Amino acid sequence: DIFEDKFLKVIKKEDISKIKYFEIEDHFFEKRFNNFVLVNKLNHETINNPMFLTSRLEFKEFLQSQKKLIRMASFYQKIRQKLSILIDDQNKPLGGKWSYDEDNRKKLPKNIDIPKIPPIQNDNKFKSLKLKINSFFYDHPGSTDYLWMPTDREESLMWLDNFFENKFSNFGNYEDAIRSENNFLFHSAISPILNMGLIT
């Protein structure tokens, strides 16, 4: 419990009367941290995580409001209305439809040019971390031999810009397309860096 011990020392040394922290999205660490707070009887406040457009409470209330089958489409509609995303002044979807899924299933033309994902420039920053991963997590699945995604905010934002500049215009048409020799096609592949909070 090295982290907890050090954190508690800082709290006592700085005479901190209350700690405030964002919701912890790693469930294992959240449980561990909550236990640390409870055992040490720390005055604390949990703040909604800015990585998400909705709070946990809001999503929980949505789930409780669903009497039968839970449909994520209903949740997306609710959030679009709340945040006025592609919504007209009558609180209806722009274009008259909530979903255009049928337009996402076009067949990928044989001669279409597929933009490559941007090469990663920050591999040097990853080298020391790679050594630690290989040392402490050597028996875990996966490999550190090839780093294909950004690990810092600067490159993550460049990655996002690249998606809008080179892929976004074709993303909708070929969202569900598959090609065996290409893993990403017109997808942004930003889910991992979104989940790490590098774009938030």
Each language-model region and where it sits:
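Catalytic cores of enzymes that engage adenine nucleotides and/or redox cofactors via long glycine-rich
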Residues: 104-200
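Proteins with a high burden of low-complexity, intrinsically disordered sequence enriched in S/T/G/P/A and R
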Residues: 1-2, 200
